[in-house]
């Protein structure tokens, strides 16, 4: 490959630190796709003879067959996937194999391979997110009216519905999917043909190879073409944000399945037991999804630090771009699939959620709103009056709705018995009719919108 310049073999330690076939063999399909596109372009442009090009293409087909069949001899001595394929091609068709590397460097070769892989990973993630959204929408539709407490600071705040709560995650995951689609648009430029860094003196057609590989256009600067890894950083950023959202939902599932909450149940399919405590049914799938954000965010940090301070153009440091990216998307894909399964699997305890919906004086804001609406009281004054009512209820050990009219009038004489119509969790939730609110009609509107968007 590059032995003409050297008079001695590299040290074993050099070979050990340099070899990457153990992980970059995952790029075999992308490497073959790039090589086919390059070979066809070389034929079309008359850079290599058609007979030679056809022989190369047949050899690449044979290599694909070997890899698919598990018969391809991946070898450490050839360092990486590119040279493993080229060496095998030479074994199959002879010296003609060497013509494939005309007007190409491993620098632009790995750049196109990696872009293709990351592009496919973004497409898979967006599709898996849509599957998760559909699972959430299905549950939300079934429980659009089911009351539960809404929380701030993990303290009861205001009544909401279970459907409304789930639809919040549909929105988050919708933004995640759009981030992957947006990243795909920016990365969809083809670096093939940039060669080592300065471009090629051969009459190549970079637009043709870009089109044949599904790119929108070739990259516009050869130095940037082989230097850039921001497409992977952007994809990892999207993955990290998505994993954060998954972690939040996973945490809630963990909480909801505890006896203290008891809001939902998971079947045996997504839980495990204990080696010593026979009664245990642990939400391990949710806990593992919650933890995966560490691996995924760590991958973003790893690649950011690798790229920080690198001069143009290619440096071997960039070999370290693949493992964190592969690991991050492996973890994300498994997390998305597991979460979709859990969401479909869970069964809410609507009675327990409804009973908890009124806990912690969760209708206090409704009392304040009634004072504003019916007595024309400034909200800050209404807030103070309501706080006094909460204090009185707390002292008596009752809920707001259980305070007598006399108790309430002792705080604000103008209060009438009509106040009791707003102090139930159901009335509270039903009153939130603003766009995007928790009123069941609004929740159903959100569901209808997403069902149309998701198809």
UniProtKB/Swiss-Prot annotation:
InterPro entries hit by this protein: Arg_succ_lyase_C, Argininosuccinate_lyase, Fumarase/histidase_N, Fumarate_lyase_CS, Fumarate_lyase_fam, Fumarate_lyase_N, L-Aspartase-like
Keywords assigned by UniProt, alphabetized: Amino-acid biosynthesis, Arginine biosynthesis, Cytoplasm, Lyase
Gene Ontology molecular function, alphabetical: argininosuccinate lyase activity
GO annotation, biological process: arginine biosynthetic process via ornithine; L-arginine biosynthetic process
Pathway: Amino-acid biosynthesis; L-arginine biosynthesis; L-arginine from L-ornithine and carbamoyl phosphate: step 3/3
Main location: cytoplasm
Transmembrane parts of this sequence: none
Catalytic reactions of this protein: 2-(N(omega)-L-arginino)succinate = fumarate + L-arginine
Pfam family, one: ASL_C2
UniProt-recorded name of the protein: Argininosuccinate lyase
Organism: Caulobacter sp. (strain K31)
Gene: argH
């Amino acid at each position: 490959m590059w032995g003409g310049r050297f008079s001695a073999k590299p040290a074993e330690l050099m070979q050990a630190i340099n070899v990457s076939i153990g992980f970059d063999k995952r790029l075999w399909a992308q490497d073959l796709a790039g090589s086919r596109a390059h070979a066809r372009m070389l034929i079309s442009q008359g850079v290599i003879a058609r007979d030679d090009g056809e022989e190369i293409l047949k050899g690449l087909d044979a290599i694909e067959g070997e890899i698919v069949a598990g018969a391809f001899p991946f070898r450490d001595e050839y360092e990486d996937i590119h040279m493993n394929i080229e060496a095998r091609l030479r074994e199959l068709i002879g010296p003609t194999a060497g013509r494939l590397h005309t007007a190409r460097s491993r620098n632009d070769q790995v750049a196109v391979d990696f872009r293709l892989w990351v592009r496919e990973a973004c497409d898979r993630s967006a599709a898996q997110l849509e599957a998760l959204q559909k699972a959430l929408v299905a549950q939300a539709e079934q429980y659009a009216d089911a009351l539960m407490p809404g929380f701030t600071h993990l303290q009861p705040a205001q009544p909401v519905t279970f459907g409304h709560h789930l639809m919040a995650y549909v929105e988050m995951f919708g933004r995640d999917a759009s981030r992957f689609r947006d990243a795909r648009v920016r990365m969809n430029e083809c670096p093939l043909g940039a060669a080592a860094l300065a471009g090629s003196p051969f009459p190549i057609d970079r637009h043709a190879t870009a089109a044949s590989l599904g790119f929108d256009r070739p990259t516009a600067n050869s130095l940037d073409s082989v230097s850039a890894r921001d497409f992977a950083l952007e994809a990892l950023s999207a993955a990290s944000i998505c994993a954060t959202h998954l972690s939040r939902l996973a945490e809630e599932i963990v909480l909801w399945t505890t006896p203290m909450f008891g809001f939902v149940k998971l079947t045996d399919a997504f839980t495990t037991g204990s080696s010593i405590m026979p009664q245990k049914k642990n939400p391990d799938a949710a806990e593992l999804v919650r933890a995966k954000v560490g691996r995924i965010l760590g991958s973003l940090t790893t690649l950011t630090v690798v790229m920080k301070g690198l001069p143009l153009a290619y440096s071997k440091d960039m070999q370290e771009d693949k493992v964190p990216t592969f690991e991050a998307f492996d973890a994300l894909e498994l997390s998305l699939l597991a979460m979709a399964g859990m969401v479909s699997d869970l069964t809410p305890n609507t009675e327990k959620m409804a009973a908890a919906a009124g806990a912690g004086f969760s209708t206090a804001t409704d009392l304040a709103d009634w004072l504003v609406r019916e007595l024309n009281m400034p909200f800050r004054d209404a807030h103070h009056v309501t706080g006094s009512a909460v204090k009185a209820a707390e002292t008596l050990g009752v809920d707001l709705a259980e305070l007598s009219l006399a108790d309430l009038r002792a705080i604000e004489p103008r209060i009438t018995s009509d106040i009791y119509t707003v102090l139930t969790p159901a009335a509270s939730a039903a009153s939130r009719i603003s766009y995007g609110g928790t009123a069941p009609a609004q929740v159903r509107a959100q569901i209808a919108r997403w069902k149309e968007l998701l198809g």
